[in-house]
Amino acid sequence: MTGNDIVVLGRLADPYGIQGWLWLYPFGDDPLAWAEMPVWWIAREGEPWRECRLKSLKAHGNGVVVLLDGVADRTAAESMKGVLVGAPREALPTTEKNEFYWTDLIGLDVINTADERIGKVVGLIETGANSVLRVMGDDKVERLLPFVSAVVLAVEKEAGQIRVEWGSDW
């Protein structure tokens, strides 16, 4: 499966306990639903995707922890830190109007209301309160724009751009 067929859903974080559990850093709003996917796709950034079986997923405190097949102890879990978790696009529900998978936003040009190009979306950050667009300008300066309706006016995937209320000098 190619990287274009996979939608990145989250990232594995720190180990939890000594039996191979890992904290999951989801890029979406319903990671408990991922338990319905018995096979996940995992990869480090820039590496090929491979299948991995989910053994267990549960809410814990304010987060989610997962146990993956082949990750038997804390040492194995430590080696998984930073690994991306994804799923084939066809296995995911279609998005509603004004809903987006993060992967669909990466690469879009960001244009402000004065028709000035701010840059290109290179990633997103989840802060808890809202998502934040990581926008790399032509000047190689990264700008962080909150993904909220007061800033993001329109996402025009077909046109390859996001319209924002944001000054070019920020």
Curated annotation (Swiss-Prot):
Task: Mention any one GO cellular component term assigned to this protein in its UniProt record.
Answer: cytoplasm
Keywords, alphabetical: Chaperone, Cytoplasm, Ribosome biogenesis, rRNA processing
Q: Does the keyword Chaperone apply?
A: yes
Q: What is its main location?
A: cytoplasm
**Domain PRC barrel: start-end pairs:** 97-170
Q: Which domain of life is it from?
A: Bacteria
- Say if the entry is tagged with keyword Cytoplasm: yes
Cellular compartments annotated: Cytoplasm
Q: Name one GO biological process term.
A: rRNA processing
- Extract the GO molecular function terms from the UniProt entry: ribosome binding
Gene3D superfamilies, alphabetized = PRC-barrel domain, RimM
**Any notes on this protein's domains?**
The PRC barrel domain binds ribosomal protein uS19.
The family classification in the record reads: Belongs to the RimM family.
Subunit architecture? Binds ribosomal protein uS19.
HAMAP family attached to this UniProt entry = Ribosome_mat_RimM
Chain's role: An accessory protein needed during the final step in the assembly of 30S ribosomal subunit, possibly for assembly of the head region. Essential for efficient processing of 16S rRNA. May be needed both before and after RbfA during the maturation of 16S rRNA. It has affinity for free ribosomal 30S subunits but not for 70S ribosomes.
Q: What is this protein called?
A: Ribosome maturation factor RimM
| Protein's organism | Dechloromonas aromatica (strain RCB)
Per UniProt, what is the name of the gene that codes for the protein in this document? rimM
